[in-house]
Amino acid sequence: MKRLYNFLSSYEKRKLRNRAKLDKSAGRLRISIFKSNKHFYVQLINDAKGTTLASASTLDDKIRNVCKGRVNAETIKQVSSLLIERLPSTKLQQRFVFDRGAYKYTGLISQFAEALRSSGFKF
């Protein structure tokens, strides 16, 4: 594994490091993020059962008209509120794991995390 690690890009190395840290916190629900230049996707995943409890993205009908193909702070707040709206209220009291993938914790990722924390998420 160590030899293969040397041939990976810095993006892939960061992704592997973050995934290894997430494995240590098994038993919690995971908030997974994917972003592109045009869209932002979020899922709340139960890894023990292998199911997705709730999801939200800028492709949803409620947000698509506001987003207009660009991801900014306003659309991030709307995606977080949509995720909270779709989540059962009993699940909101649990602790979560924030899976940022290979993305650095700056910009839109940190704004999304702060929006969730202000709504009552604990991670």
Curated annotation (Swiss-Prot):
Disulphides: none
Gene3D superfamilies according to UniProt: 3.30.420.100
CC per GO annotation: cytosolic large ribosomal subunit
Key words of the record: Ribonucleoprotein, Ribosomal protein, RNA-binding, rRNA-binding
SUPFAM superfamilies: Translational machinery components (SSF53137)
Keyword Ribosomal protein: yes
GO biological process, one term: translation
Top-rank lineage group of the source organism: Bacteria
Gene Ontology MF: a single term: structural constituent of ribosome
Coiled-coil segments on the chain, per record: none
InterPro entries per record: Ribosomal_uL18_bac-type, Ribosomal_uL18_bac/euk
Biological role: This is one of the proteins that bind and probably mediate the attachment of the 5S RNA into the large ribosomal subunit, where it forms part of the central protuberance.
Family in the record: Belongs to the universal ribosomal protein uL18 family.
PANTHER family: 39S RIBOSOMAL PROTEIN L18, MITOCHONDRIAL (PTHR12899), LARGE RIBOSOMAL SUBUNIT PROTEIN UL18M (PTHR12899:SF3)
Quaternary context: Part of the 50S ribosomal subunit; part of the 5S rRNA/L5/L18/L25 subcomplex. Contacts the 5S and 23S rRNAs.
Name of this chain's protein: Large ribosomal subunit protein uL18
Gene expressing this chain: rplR
